[in-house]
């Protein structure tokens, strides 16, 4: 919540200084005044249950801090809802996007001028100094004190609401689906009184995805390798291969399957070159994360594994934010379907 109190509440407090009845009636009067002020704002109050924490909003936040979390879901959702002016500090950026102008819009947002910690995110003291009224984190990691971050309770004490994105409560995003992108849009739509806009975005995405899925229905489902370009997450040669999560839902809607879905119980697989070479890969999806040329990385992989059907047919696509939690999953579904089933488009 904003640290600014409603005008009606402030006025009630001022009146208490000059009346003799305030000693007994301050609580009642203040509550009534706050209820009156809240009633004057259509769409509020809004209450969200988020990872076991109840968050109540009596007005739209105006000092939002978006934590990094190796995500662009939260900042992209805010921009899709036309809320860029509410952001006082954003740490998210992929440096590219399937949505024209989005990468530039993200770059233009303020970063708060803070010095980031070793996790490339906003440390506790700097966060408090930003005076946020809402802090967004893609997982609960961003509110873990042992990681050097301000906790949700500490932020509540300084008047800030907090929000962990869908499936991020336990830091396990392996069950994430496209529906979670819609949940994020809906939640932010409610918080900022932009529900109508959120529902329009969701309806358009659902329509696009349904149209693509209808076209590829009944087609053979190629086996697809999805991985991040030039990124190391483990000790093996290929540690950023996608195994589970929203990526698989996108592949399914596009008429494909994940070639490495069984390689790990978590979101990512950490595999040797030999294991990768022994797997049939019909198509390749490379996700660019601050990589200026993920397509070059894709071509390099195809040369490295010429036995793949993907290499023989030069079947690949380079994507970025549309493959992750966020408002643009329909773009990834479309582009992957066009790659996998060119004869149907």
Task: Kindly label every feature range from the protein language model.
Residues 175-184, 263, 275-279, 283-345:
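Structured C-terminal subdomain patch of bacterial secreted/periplasmic proteins
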Residues 66-130, 134, 139-143:
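A short, structured surface patch at a secondary-structure boundary
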Residues 2-77, 190-228, 280, 288, ...:
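Bacterial Sec-exported substrate-binding components of ABC uptake systems
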Residues 237-268:
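Alpha-helical, coiled-coil/dimerization segments enriched in small aliphatic residues
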